[in-house]
Amino acid sequence: MLLRQYINVPRLGEIMNLKELTVILIIPIVYLGVCGCFEIVPKSFYDNFSSYNVGDKAPFGEWKVKEGGFKIEAILSEDKKTLNKVAVPINNGIIYIDKNYTDFKFIVDIKRLEESDSPKIYFRLINNANAGYYIDIEGFDRGYVLYKFNGTKVEKLAESYDAAPAGTDFYRYEVVAKDNKIIFLAGGQKYIEYTDNNTPILKGGIGIGGGRAYYDNVRVEPIE
């Protein structure tokens, strides 16, 4: 009697209430997962292609192929002292990371093979990269153009007739996407700022390719 007096032994009704509470807590979580209402924000992403072998062809790592092909090559660093692995399109190929980034900074280093080349930067890609936005880095440093596309439909949204003097050197390009505003920078200088008020795409993956160039140091950083 004394032992039972000091030990809190749960009654049957209390056990049932605990089970009911567990069910009540689990059902909404399962529902959120099934309906897609609950979504985990993707973490930051970085790839300098050093973990792959020279000659590897996409898909590799987290990269998927949208069209054409991509391969890993080794080229001399800018100081010509070491070999550096980079990603190169095959037949103007495009590869992409299939994640739902909403607000983010997307940074990539690009080096044209020839001054006439026009590589591209893709972002907020959806539907297996069949829709989204891209920046066209025009050849001969003529400028930059922001496009929105859906399948074969392509719409020019904004452009800059000024451009950084990249030539055939590695240059750092950056896209900042927050809500429906898009900012494009080259070498830290802003060249395009555009607000898409016509059914904007507010989340999606990122991609590279669409023109002859070396790509390196691809980075995506979510922003608040």
Swiss-Prot record:
Pfam short name (any one): 3keto-disac_hyd
Top-rank taxon, per record: Archaea
GO MF assignments: hydrolase activity
Any one Gene Ontology cellular component term annotated for this protein: membrane
Main location: membrane
Keyword Transmembrane helix: yes
UniProt-recorded name of the protein: Uncharacterized protein MJ0945
Keywords in alphabetical order: Membrane, Transmembrane, Transmembrane helix
Subcellular locations according to the entry: Membrane
Origin species: Methanocaldococcus jannaschii (strain ATCC 43067 / DSM 2661 / JAL-1 / JCM 10045 / NBRC 100440)
